[in-house]
C-alpha cells in the first residue's frame, strides 16, 4: 500500500504526461504486478492509450495470462472500446460475459440482472486459461434465450484476455483481474439527458426527475453496477456524441421497385452472404408530441431476442437517406421505464428482411407486414458504391428519400402499424390500452367475446339486469375502439383484414342458422307433447299473447321470467298450473333447454348485429371513396348512419320473433294444463 500511495503522489506530480501516469505496483502477498489507480477520469482516447500502455507493462512483468476486465453500463461504449483495442492488438482474445447467460435464471426478460451470469462456467474457463489450457466458451442466442453451442478458445499469442460485460468488475472476478477498466458516459448519459429534456419540455417539474430516471430507466445501475466501477484502476468517461456518427455515415437508397433474388445475386460478388431477419421497431413518442408530426422519436428495436435503443437524426440528400447508425443494447425493462416517465408507444413497425451482404454494401428486401408492402434498400459506407449497386439493380429513378416513419407520417398511416409483438406483451405485461387498438376488427372481436363471456356468466347467476348493464358498457367500449380507429378503417377498406372480417361474418351466420334449426326442432317436439291438452287459454293469457304477437311487450317482460331456464318472476299467473308444471320434470327440462337455446340465439344475434353494422360502415366508406368535397362526405356520413340503423332492424325483429314464439308456446301449454 505504501508503494500504491507513492504511485498516486507521483501521478499527481506528473499530471501532464499520460504515459508516466501508468505505473506498476506489486500486489500484496503475490508475485504479480498491477496498475496503480489513476485518480483522474480519462477521455475515451486517453483511456485507450492508458489501457494499451498498461497491457504492455503488465505483459512484461507478469507471467502467464493477463486478464483485463472492461465494465460499464449499457450504452457506455464498452464494446466499441474493446473493438478498438482488438483492432490495435489483433492477438488479444475477447470474452463477452453475455455468452455466459443462464436462461433458466432470467426473470421478466431482464438481462441486466447480475444473477443471470453463469459464474461457475466463466471462472472455470478463466482458471483453465491461466493454466494454459484450451477452453470451450459458450455461445448464447438471445433470440431463443438459450445456449446454442461452444467455441474453442486457445491462449492468445499476446497472453492478453479481455473480459467485457456489465459485471466484468464484480466481486467474483476482481481477484483474478490484472487490470480493471470502467467505461461510463456515452449514450448512457445522452439518454438520461435526452429523457430529462423531453420531460422538462412537456412542462413537468424537474424535481427528482434524475432520481426517477435512474430508478426506472436503469434500475440495476445504482444498485449493482456503479459500486463495482469505483474499483477500476483506469476510469474512462466516454463523451461520445451519438450524432458524431455522421463522420462515418451510412448511405441508404430506398425504392418500391421489385427486384428478384437472382438479379441481386448477379450484381453482388460471389462472396456475399445471405440471411433473413425479423425486427420490431417501437417508436416512442416524447411527452406532449403529436405522432403525425413528431421528428424526435426514440426508437427501440427488438431483434433476435435483444433490445436496443436507436437515436434518430436522419438527414436526406436526395435521393440518399443518411443515417448515423448509432445503437446500443438496453434491458427489456427500459420500455416500461420510459413509459412510466410519460413516453407513449406511437407506432410499432414489424419488418421481415432478406439481407444480401458483402464487405462494403448491403442489399435488403424489406417486407412491412402491416403495410403489406415490399421495399428495396441498398446500404453502405461508400456513397459511390451504394449508388452504382442501386443502378445495376435497375432502381434508378424510383428512389424514395424518406425513412419508414416519415413515409408512414406522410401517408397518415400511424394507426395501421400498431401490432404489439407478443413477446413484448408477455415480458412487459403491457395493457392494450397503452397503445391504440391493433385493428378495429380485433377490437370488435374482443368486445364481442367480453359480451358473450359476461352473458354466460350472468346466465348461470340469473342476473339478466346486470347483463344488460354490462352489455351497455361493452357497447360503449366497442364504440371507443371504433372511434379511435375510424381513420384506419377509412384508409384500409381494401386491406386483407376485410377478408377475415367477411369470413368471420359467414361463420357467425352459419352458427346462427344451426342454432335456429335446433330451436325450431325443439319447439316442434314440444308442440307435439302439448297437443293432447285442449283447454282454452284465459283472457289474461290471450291479452298477453296479443301484446307479444304485436311486438308491443317489452323484451324484459319475458326475459325476466327466463332466468336460469325457469319461470321465476314471469308473466304467468300464480295458479295450480304452475305447480303442475313444476311436477312435470321431463317437460320442465325441455322448457329449460329451450330457454337456454333462446338466449344462445340472442348471443349470436348480438354479435351478428355488430358485425353487420361494421359491414354496412365498410360499404358506405367504399361508396364515398370517390367523393372529393366535404358536402359529399357529409351526405355519405348520413347515409352510413342510415345504413347502420337499417342493419339493426333484422336482428331486432328476429330477437322479438323468437322470444314471442317461445313465450306463446309456454303460455299455450300452461293454459291448456289449466
Swiss-Prot record:
Gene Ontology cellular-component terms listed: mitochondrial outer membrane
Stretches assigned to the CYTH domain: 248-410
UniProt entry keywords in alphabetical sequence: Hydrolase, Hypersensitive response, Membrane, Mitochondrion, Mitochondrion outer membrane, Plant defense, Transmembrane, Transmembrane helix
Keyword Protease included in the entry's annotation: no
Main location: mitochondrion
Listed transmembrane segments: 650-670
Disordered as annotated region, ranges: 457-498, 619-640
Molecular function terms from GO: ATP binding; inorganic diphosphate phosphatase activity; kinase activity; pyrophosphatase activity
Family annotation (InterPro entries): CYTH-like_dom_sf, CYTH_domain, P-loop_NTPase, PRK/URK
Result of knocking out the encoding gene: Enhanced hypersensitive response, elevated pathogen resistance against both virulent and avirulent pathogens (e.g. isolates Emwa1 and Emco5 of the oomycete pathogen H.arabidopsidis, the bacterial pathogen P.syringae DC3000 (AvrRps4)). Elevated accumulation of salicylic acid (SA) and conjugates (e.g. salicylic acid glucoside (SAG)) upon infection. Stronger systemic acquired resistance (SAR). These increased defense responses are PAD4-, ICS1- and NPR1-dependent.
Stated induction or repression of this protein's expression: Repressed by the oomycete pathogen H.arabidopsidis. Negatively regulated by salicylic acid (SA), benzothiadiazole (BTH) and pathogen-associated molecular patterns (PAMP, e.g. flg22).
Cellular location(s): Mitochondrion outer membrane
GO terms, biological process: defense response to other organism; negative regulation of defense response to bacterium; negative regulation of defense response to oomycetes; negative regulation of systemic acquired resistance; plant-type hypersensitive response; regulation of salicylic acid mediated signaling pathway; response to molecule of bacterial origin; response to oomycetes
Tissue distribution of the protein: Predominantly expressed in the shoot apices of inflorescences.
Compositional bias per record (Low complexity), positions renumbered to this chain: 623-640
pH-dependence annotation: Optimum pH is 8-9.
Stated role: Exhibits pyrophosphatase activity with stronger affinity for pyrophosphate (PPi), moderate affinity for ATP and ADP, and weak affinity for tripolyphosphate (PPPi). No activity observed toward uridine substrate. Negative regulator of the salicylic acid (SA)-mediated amplification of defense responses against both virulent and avirulent pathogens, including oomycetes (e.g. H.arabidopsidis) and bacteria (e.g. P.syringae). Represses systemic acquired resistance (SAR).
Protein name per the record: Inorganic pyrophosphatase TTM2
Taxonomic source organism: Arabidopsis thaliana
Recorded name of the encoding gene: TTM2
Amino acid at each position: 500500500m505504501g508503494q500504491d500511495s507513492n504511485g498516486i503522489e507521483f501521478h499527481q506530480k506528473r499530471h501532464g504526461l499520460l504515459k508516466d501516469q501508468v505505473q506498476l505496483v506489486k500486489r500484496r502477498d503475490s508475485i504479480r504486478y498491477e496498475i496503480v489507480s489513476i485518480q483522474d477520469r480519462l477521455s475515451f482516447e486517453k483511456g485507450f492509450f492508458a489501457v494499451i500502455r498498461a497491457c504492455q507493462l503488465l505483459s512484461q512483468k507478469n507471467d502467464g495470462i493477463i486478464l483485463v476486465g472492461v465494465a460499464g453500463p449499457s450504452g457506455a461504449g464498452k464494446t466499441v472500446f474493446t473493438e478498438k483495442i482488438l483492432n490495435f492488438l489483433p492477438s488479444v482474445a475477447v470474452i463477452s460475459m453475455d455468452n455466459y447467460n443462464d436462461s433458466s435464471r432470467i426473470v421478466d426478460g431482464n438481462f441486466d440482472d447480475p444473477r443471470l451470469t453463469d459464474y461457475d462456467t466463466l471462472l472455470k474457463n478463466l482458471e483453465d486459461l491461466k493454466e494454459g489450457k484450451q477452453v470451450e466458451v459458450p455461445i448464447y442466442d438471445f433470440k431463443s434465450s438459450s445456449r446454442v453451442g461452444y467455441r474453442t478458445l486457445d491462449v492468445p499469442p499476446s497472453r492478453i484476455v479481455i473480459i467485457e460485460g456489465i459485471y466484468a468488475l464484480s466481486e467474483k472476478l476482481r481477484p483474478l483481474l490484472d487490470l480493471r477498466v470502467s467505461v461510463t458516459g456515452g449514450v448512457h448519459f445522452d439518454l438520461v439527458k435526452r429523457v430529462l429534456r423531453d420531460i422538462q419540455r412537456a412542462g413537468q417539474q424537474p424535481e427528482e426527475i434524475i432520481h426517477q430516471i435512474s430508478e426506472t430507466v436503469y434500475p440495476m445501475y445504482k444498485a449493482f453496477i456503479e459500486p463495482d466501477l469505483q474499483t477500476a484502476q483506469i476510469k474512462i468517461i466516454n463523451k461520445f456524441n451519438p450524432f458524431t456518427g455522421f463522420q462515418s455515415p451510412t448511405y441508404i437508397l430506398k425504392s418500391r421497385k421489385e427486384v428478384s433474388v437472382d438479379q441481386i445475386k448477379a450484381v453482388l460478388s460471389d462472396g456475399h452472404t445471405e440471411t433473413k431477419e425479423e425486427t420490431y421497431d417501437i417508436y416512442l413518442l416524447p411527452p406532449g408530441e403529436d405522432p403525425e408530426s413528431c421528428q424526435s422519436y426514440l426508437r427501440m428495436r427488438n431483434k433476435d431476442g435483444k433490445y436496443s435503443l436507436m437515436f434518430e437524426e436522419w438527414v436526406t440528400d436526395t435521393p440518399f437517406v443518411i443515417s448515423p447508425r448509432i445503437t446500443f443494447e438496453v434491458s427489456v425493462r427500459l420500455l416500461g421505464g420510459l413509459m412510466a416517465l410519460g413516453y407513449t408507444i406511437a407506432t410499432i413497425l414489424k419488418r421481415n428482411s432478406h439481407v444480401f451482404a458483402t464487405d462494403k454494401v448491403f442489399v435488403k428486401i424489406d417486407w412491412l407486414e402491416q403495410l403489406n408492402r415490399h421495399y428495396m434498400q441498398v446500404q453502405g459506407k461508400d456513397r459511390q458504391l451504394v449508388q452504382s449497386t442501386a443502378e445495376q439493380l435497375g432502381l434508378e429513378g424510383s428512389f424514395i428519400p424518406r425513412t419508414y416513419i416519415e413515409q408512414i407520417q406522410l401517408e397518415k398511416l400511424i394507426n395501421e402499424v400498431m401490432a404489439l409483438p407478443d413477446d413484448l406483451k408477455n415480458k412487459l405485461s403491457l395493457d392494450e390500452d397503452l397503445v391504440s387498438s391493433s385493428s378495429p376488427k380485433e377490437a370488435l372481436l374482443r368486445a364481442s367475446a367480453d359480451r358473450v363471456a359476461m352473458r354466460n356468466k350472468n346466465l348461470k347467476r340469473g342476473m339478466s339486469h346486470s347483463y344488460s348493464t354490462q352489455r351497455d358498457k361493452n357497447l360503449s367500449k366497442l364504440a371507443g375502439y371504433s372511434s379511435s380507429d375510424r381513420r384506419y378503417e377509412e384508409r384500409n377498406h381494401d386491406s386483407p383484414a376485410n377478408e377475415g372480417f367477411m369470413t368471420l361474418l359467414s361463420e357467425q351466420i352459419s352458427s346462427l342458422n344451426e342454432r335456429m334449426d335446433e330451436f325450431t326442432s325443439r319447439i316442434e317436439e314440444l308442440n307435439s307433447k302439448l297437443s293432447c291438452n285442449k283447454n282454452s287459454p284465459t283472457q289474461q293469457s290471450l291479452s298477453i299473447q296479443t301484446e307479444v304477437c304485436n311486438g308491443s311487450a317489452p323484451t324484459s317482460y319475458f326475459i325476466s321470467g327466463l332466468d336460469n331456464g325457469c319461470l321465476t318472476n314471469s308473466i304467468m299467473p300464480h295458479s295450480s298450473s304452475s305447480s303442475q308444471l313444476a311436477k312435470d320434470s321431463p317437460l320442465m327440462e325441455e322448457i329449460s333447454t329451450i330457454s337456454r337455446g333462446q338466449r344462445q340465439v340472442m348471443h349470436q344475434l348480438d354479435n351478428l348485429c355488430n358485425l353487420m353494422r361494421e359491414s354496412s360502415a365498410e360499404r358506405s366508406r367504399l361508396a364515398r371513396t370517390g367523393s372529393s368535397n366535404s358536402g359529399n362526405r357529409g351526405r355519405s356520413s348520413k347515409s352510413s348512419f342510415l345504413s347502420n340503423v337499417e342493419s339493426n332492424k333484422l336482428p331486432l325483429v328476429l330477437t322479438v320473433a323468437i322470444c314471442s314464439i317461445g313465450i306463446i308456446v309456454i303460455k299455450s301449454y300452461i293454459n291448456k294444463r289449466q
